[in-house]
Amino acid sequence: MKLDNDIFVYEWTNPMENNCNSFFIGGSVRALIDPGLAVFLPDLLGKMAEEGIDTDAIQYVISTHSHPDHFEASAAFTGNQNVRIGLHSEGITFLNGMGGRMYGLFGLDAPQVDIDMPLEEGPITLGGEDFEILHTPGHSPGSISLYWPARKALFPGDVIFDQNIGRTDFPGGSGPLLKESILKLARLEVEYLLPGHMGIIIGSEQVQRNFEFVINRVFPYI
C-alpha cells in the first residue's frame, strides 16, 4: 500500500503465521525496511512489484533488529553487489552469539548474511536523503529505529506498537532499556508511526496520544 510519496506499507495481517510489517522507501532511496521471514519474501516482493516497484533496484535492506521475523530474509540479498545490508553493530554481535542460537527455538537455522553496512546511532544518508539512526534497545540488543525527519516518519521496529510494546522476555531483552528507548522516541516529531507489528498510526496527535498511552498505561507492567 502506498502511504505517502515514496513510503509503501506492507502490513502483516495473517493471524495464523508470525511475520513482521515491512516497508519500502522509494524515490532515490529504494530501501526495504525489515524484509521479514525468508519463506514470505517472494510474496512481499510480488506485492511490491504489483505496485510498480522494481524490486531489482533495491539499494538498501535495513533490519531494525536481528530476530527471525524481521531479519531472516536479508540472506536473499547477500551476494547482490547492488544492495547494502544494514544492521546495528550490537545486533551483529548478538546475531553471532545468542541471537543466532535463538533461531533454533523457531526451528530455523541462523541465516548467513554479509552485513556490509553496520549501523550506529546518528545521521545517515540513504540515496541522497537524510535519515537518523536511533539505538533503541530493550526488545533486542542492537535494536534501532529509523527516523526520516523530512517526512516525520518513524520506523521503530518492535520498540512500540499501537497501544503496546515489544516483548522483553526474549534473550537480551530489558524492560528498563525499553522504557528508555520509548521515552527517547517520544521526543521526536512524528507524523507517521510505522511499527514492526500491528497497525500503523497516522497524524502527530494520534502518535503522541499513543506514546502517552504506552507511558501511562503500559510502563507500570514492564
Annotate each PLM feature:
Residues 38-39, 130-222:
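Metallo-beta-lactamase
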Residues 19, 94-98, 164:
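Short, charged, surface-exposed secondary-structure boundary motifs
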Residues 31-33, 62, 85, 155, ...:
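Residue-level marker for buried hydrophobic side chains located in beta-strands
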Residues 22, 96-99, 205-206:
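Short, well-ordered secondary-structure micro-motifs
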Residues 1-51, 145-157:
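Conserved beta-strand hairpin/beta-sheet module of binuclear metal-dependent hydrolase folds
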Residues 15, 90-92, 160-161:
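Short, acidic/turn-prone active-site loops that include or flank metal/cofactor-
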Residues 37-43, 49-124, 213, 217:
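Active-site HxH/HxHxD metal-binding segment of metal-dependent hydrolases
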Residues 8-13, 36, 61-64, 131-134, ...:
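Short, flexible loop segments at the rims of nucleotide/cofactor-binding pockets, characterized by
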